[in-house]
């Protein structure tokens, strides 16, 4: 156990975590040059295409240090995006140390701080690494000063490297062996293993990733899940060496996987403790905080025959994505579907894309919303995240909406533009300070509903890509909320209803009407598209009718003949309008999701 090191790589988005992990794997000779590919640990196509890490991945690296001893380094590559910070917190519980990567050109950014605080909460030893020193714009001395002064980390531990070229990677591996502590635990004690992740394999069932705190486990053992008491027979144990590699036993201090023919998704909840039936441990390990969903949207299959497939797909996705929640939902316009909870808009996009790609289901999503708290006139409170469940306005005493504390790191020259953006989004209690010369940390309290829409894109736009953003939920505050209904041909479309602040209702209504006008095909009769709050129409647009030239066969002659034909056409269109249904194409629902620029 003295020769084991368990560590994570944490950083802001695009600071080079996955690239450094690739170089470490190459340096340790785990994979041949022929089998190597970039972003080796990012298994999903969507991760490779977007250049982001969504799912934490584990790999076991054998390494011979400069003292000549063989060490086992268990590396966990983590995501950098704020939506997936729960993946980071789960990965950190299985480690004793972390590499904190900072870009030599960008310096310390918002997510760098957030992930550092997560590591400190877990009492991890931290080795700062300044990456991308090969860039022409790199300023390693300046960034080293930032790390020492802003983060309070030891400057003597700072490692310089270029993950792209491989410079400095060997020194980082030596530093891990030298400065990170070995795991503590007793291999002879009763088994205590913490599940920190799980993946679904269609042939082998659930693959659980575990960190053994005490004891040993081998194939043939009967394991017990401590919270549920369910028991399974272990089929295989092993380590992650890019691919799974079976072993006879796993011992205290090691990070590996267990296969036990587990078919049900719910049993393998991350944070669960596993022990042996024959020699159980006395107490379960401290688990994880339940992750809080902040964005809610309804998902429906475009083809209603795909509903059963969607049920299966969500169940399987839930195993790989502990933060996803869903419950059954139905809509007059779209049929049966699910109301899902997500960690943010990127998480929502990723789930949608994975369902469409991996399970080949075409989907439609409703407008995202957050969870509001209503106090009703009879004194009861009601949590609402779906516009369909909006209480009767005459019974509402008070509405509260979630607020976040946003930390925005920007170059000084963009201060005015960012302040305007925050004020547009109903920002409050703005403060700022200078972490380093020329850079400002702008702290602002914002309604979450204003952030989930397109705040991150707008921030990147006004700061020309230099702004970074992190947030945490703080509390619920009183708000003036209304339900915005969209009516097509005087019929409300429930799937397009939105909960919005009264100040933004007209703007959002106009945007939705204009988007629908572009997407709904013209009919033989005029279609009115309206946005209404209760009985008051706040925005309206019309789709003009297609017109057949009924007077084409009239050559001159009496005007009354033309008028008679036009009146006859008008009466026919009026009759058509009263009985005609307007089919709203799927693209129209997606268009309403697009935020106003």
Swiss-Prot record:
It comes from Desulfotalea psychrophila (strain LSv54 / DSM 12343). Its main location: membrane. Residues 2-184 form the tr-type G domain. Belongs to the TRAFAC class translation factor GTPase superfamily. Classic translation factor GTPase family. LepA subfamily. CDD domains: EF4_II, EF4_III, LepA, lepA_C. GO terms for molecular function: GTP binding; GTPase activity; ribosome binding; translation elongation factor activity. The keyword GTP-binding applies. The lineage of its organism: Bacteria, Pseudomonadati, Thermodesulfobacteriota, Desulfobulbia, Desulfobulbales. It catalyses: GTP + H2O = GDP + phosphate + H(+). GTP binds at residues 14-19, 131-134. Its EC number is 3.6.5.n1. Keywords: Cell inner membrane, Cell membrane, GTP-binding, Hydrolase, Membrane, Nucleotide-binding, Protein biosynthesis. It holds the Pfam family LepA_C. Required for accurate and efficient protein synthesis under certain stress conditions. May act as a fidelity factor of the translation reaction, by catalyzing a one-codon backward translocation of tRNAs on improperly translocated ribosomes. Back-translocation proceeds from a post-translocation (POST) complex to a pre-translocation (PRE) complex, thus giving elongation factor G a second chance to translocate the tRNAs correctly. Binds to ribosomes in a GTP-dependent manner. NCBIfam families: lepA, small_GTP. InterPro entries: EF-4 (IPR006297), EFG_III/V (IPR035647), EFG_V-like (IPR000640), EFTu-like_2 (IPR004161), G_TR_CS (IPR031157), LepA_C_sf (IPR038363), LepA_CTD (IPR013842), LepA_IV (IPR035654). It is found in: Cell inner membrane. It is a peripheral membrane protein. This is Elongation factor 4. GO terms for biological process: positive regulation of translation.
């Amino acid at each position: 156990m003295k020769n084991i090191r368990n560590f994570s790589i944490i950083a802001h988005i695009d600071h080079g975590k996955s690239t450094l992990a690739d170089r470490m794997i190459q340096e340790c000779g785990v994979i041949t040059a022929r089998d190597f590919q970039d972003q080796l640990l990012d298994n999903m196509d969507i991760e490779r295409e977007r250049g982001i890490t969504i799912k934490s991945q584990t790999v076991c690296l054998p390494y011979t240090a400069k003292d000549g001893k063989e060490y086992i380094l268990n590396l966990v590559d983590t995501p950098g995006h704020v939506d997936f910070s729960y993946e980071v917190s789960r990965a950190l519980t299985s480690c004793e140390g972390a590499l904190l990567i900072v870009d030599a050109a960008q310096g310390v950014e918002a997510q760098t701080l957030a992930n550092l605080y997560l590591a400190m909460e877990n009492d991890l030893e931290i080795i700062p690494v300044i990456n991308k020193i090969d860039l022409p714009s790199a300023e390693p001395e300046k960034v080293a000063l930032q790390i020492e002064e802003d983060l309070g980390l030891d400057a003597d531990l700072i490692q310089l490297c270029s993950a792209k070229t491989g410079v400095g990677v060997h020194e980082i591996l030596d530093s891990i062996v030298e400065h990170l502590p070995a795991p503590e635990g007793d291999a002879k004690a009763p088994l205590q293993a913490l599940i920190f992740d799980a993946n679904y394999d269609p042939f082998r069932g659930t693959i659980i990733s575990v960190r053994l705190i005490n004891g040993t486990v081998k194939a043939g053992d009967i394991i017990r899940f401590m919270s549920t008491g369910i028991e399974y027979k272990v089929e295989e144990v092993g380590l992650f060496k890019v691919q799974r590699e079976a072993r006879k036993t796993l011992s205290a201090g090691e990070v590996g996987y267990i296969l036990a023919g587990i078919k049900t998704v719910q049993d393998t909840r991350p944070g669960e403790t596993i022990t042996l039936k024959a020699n159980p441990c006395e107490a379960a390990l401290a688990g994880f905080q339940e992750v809080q969903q902040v964005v809610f949207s309804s998902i429906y299959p475009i083809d209603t025959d795909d509903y059963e497939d969607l049920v299966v797909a969500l169940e399987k996705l839930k195993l790989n994505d502990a933060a996803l929640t869903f419950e059954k939902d139905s809509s007059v316009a779209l049929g049966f579907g699910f109301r899902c909870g997500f960690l943010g808009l990127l998480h929502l996009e990723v789930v949608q894309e994975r369902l469409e790609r991996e399970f080949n289901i075409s989907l439609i999503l409703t407008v995202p919303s957050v969870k509001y708290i209503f106090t009703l006139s009879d004194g009861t409170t009601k949590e609402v995240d779906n516009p369909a469940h909006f209480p009767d306005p005459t019974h509402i005493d008070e509405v509260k909406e979630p607020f976040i504390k946003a930390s925005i790191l920007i170059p000084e020259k963009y201060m005015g533009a960012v302040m305007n953006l925050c004020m547009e989004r109903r920002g409050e209690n703005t403060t700022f300070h200078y972490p380093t010369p020329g850079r400002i940390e702008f702290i602002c309290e914002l309604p979450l509903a204003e952030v989930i829409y397109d705040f991150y894109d707008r921030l990147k736009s006004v700061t020309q890509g230099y702004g970074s953003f992190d947030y945490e939920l703080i509390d619920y505050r009183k708000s003036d909320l209304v339900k915005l209904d969209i009516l097509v041909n005087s019929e409300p479309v429930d799937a397009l209803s939105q909960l919005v602040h009264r100040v933004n209702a007209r703007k959002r209504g106009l945007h939705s009407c204009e988007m629908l006008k572009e997407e709904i095909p013209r009919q033989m009769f005029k279609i009115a598209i309206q946005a209404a709050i209760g009985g008051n129409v706040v925005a309206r647009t019309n789709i003009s009718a297609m017109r057949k030239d009924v007077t084409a066969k009239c050559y001159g002659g009496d005007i009354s003949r033309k008028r008679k034909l036009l009146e006859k056409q008008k009466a026919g269109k009026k009759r058509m309008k009263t009985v005609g249904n307007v089919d709203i194409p799927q693209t129209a629902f997606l268009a309403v999701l697009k935020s106003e620029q």
